[in-house]
Amino acid sequence: MINNQESLRSQTFFCIKYIISLSFFFILIYQLLNFLVLRPYAEYLWNHYQTDVFLNSSQEERIFAKLQNFEEEMQFDMLISYTYPLNPQVLHKEMEEKAFELAHMSNNESINSIAHVFTDLLIAFLIFCLLINAKKEIAIIQTYIDQYIYSLTDAKKSFFLILFTDIFVGFHSSHGWKILIELCLTHLGLPENKGFIFLFVATFPVILDTLFKYWIFLYLNRISPSAVATFNNMNE
């Protein structure tokens, strides 16, 4: 009994230490690659070989919307101000300065998006190499996770199952998926295609829900039928 507890404690310490070390390693590598190597290269390519101001149509729409909002705010402030009456020359100068500021911001956003694409690809390649060469460590972590899941009571297993399904495939999950896809597209500098986003939100949670139910039927129902019964009762 004591040996089992010591073994479990040792596995827990190893898993936590390994995951934290990997997380810090990949975060550090990502920042170094992005800011010291790939971003300067992307900045050189964009500023020397690209004539367009915007990377995609979505970025252009966002910048124009910000410029329009700024113009409306300026006009409103001048209309209600007794000290500074409405002056077209002042408005034009302020608009010109704001346009240059937004153009500079758009330029940096485009450079960052290009650098993110190459950095993400390199990090994905490093993770793939890690999965191939660290099979022993991954097997230890997988064994620990299995033991931890098996040690949970049926009520706790059912709670985590319901929590997972409600977050990823629940009624309100579509809003979260929509925000996540928009953030990913912006991160990679891709246009925010509304049709693609709506199609993804309409189909991906359904596919995920189907795979989850298939996993319950094929795997969980075999190793822990009581947990499945508790899960169904809690769902009802």
Curated annotation (Swiss-Prot):
Molecular-function GO terms, alphabetical: antiporter activity; proton transmembrane transporter activity
Cellular-component GO terms for this entry: chloroplast inner membrane
Compartments (UniProt record): Plastid, Chloroplast inner membrane
Transmembrane segments: 18-38, 114-134, 161-181, 196-216
Membrane topology summary: Multi-pass membrane protein
Keyword DNA-binding: no
Main localization, broad class: plastid
One protein family per Pfam: CemA
Reaction(s) the record says it catalyses: K(+)(in) + H(+)(out) = K(+)(out) + H(+)(in)
GO BP, one annotated term: potassium ion transport
Keyword vocabulary terms for this entry: Antiport, Chloroplast, Hydrogen ion transport, Ion transport, Membrane, Plastid, Plastid inner membrane, Potassium, Potassium transport, Transmembrane, Transmembrane helix, Transport
Entry keyword annotation includes Chloroplast: yes
Primary role: Contributes to K(+)/H(+) antiport activity by supporting proton efflux to control proton extrusion and homeostasis in chloroplasts in a light-dependent manner to modulate photosynthesis. Prevents excessive induction of non-photochemical quenching (NPQ) under continuous-light conditions. Indirectly promotes efficient inorganic carbon uptake into chloroplasts.
Family: Belongs to the CemA family.
PANTHER family: CHLOROPLAST ENVELOPE MEMBRANE PROTEIN, CHLOROPLAST ENVELOPE MEMBRANE PROTEIN-RELATED
Protein name: Potassium/proton antiporter CemA
Organism of this sequence: Mesostigma viride
